[in-house]
Amino acid sequence: MKMRLLMLSALLSTLLGTARAGEGEKVSYDAPAVSGVNQDGATVNFADVYKKGPTVVFFYPKADTPGCTKQACSLRDAFADLSKDGVQVLGVSFDKPDAQKAFKDKFTLPYDLIADPEGKIVEAFKVEKMARGLLSLAKRSCFLIKDGKVVWQDYAASTDKQAEDIKRVLAQTK
């Protein structure tokens, strides 16, 4: 009986083990066809962005905080390389457009930041929500979309190595 419990415990630990940042998993399902407002107040239709090429959609808890800044700047620093491969990048958080604009301008981010104060995009991507007092925050996550399909997802996304993770996955999915 003890042996069965130990084996069952080991099996469950393996199956339910926590993901480490940057590992993610290969998947294949339709990408959410949502829309949101960017830092300039313009509506961004995600399905239209997906048609332009591979798309990285990353979620971060709060604009202009240390971990979120590392994640966003990692993608900023690799943006020229990613763009050569036709990759589009969208960042999403619960922040309002004015906070997204300040974050984008402060760190010269070359891609749109989408305001999702009601959490509709967060919900569509099944990103975990965290509560900090009265604030709702999106758990750091990242998705790679190709041809309208999510092909990779990472619900434990890296901060400063986000771009490296994306480049690795892009190379594996060519």
Feature annotation, model-predicted:
Residues T69-T108:
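Structural microenvironment flanking redox-active thiols in thiol-disulfide oxidoreductases
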Residues M7-L15:
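Bacterial N-terminal signal peptides
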Residues R20-A47:
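N-terminal "domain-start" segment that seeds a small globular fold
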Residues M1-M7:
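Bacterial N-terminal signal peptides that target proteins for export
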Residues F46-T69:
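Short active-site neighborhood of thiol/selenol oxidoreductases, capturing the structured segment around
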Residues L137-K174:
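Thiol-/selenol-based redox modules, centered on thioredoxin-like
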Residues L90, K104-K139:
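Short, internal strand/loop/helix patches
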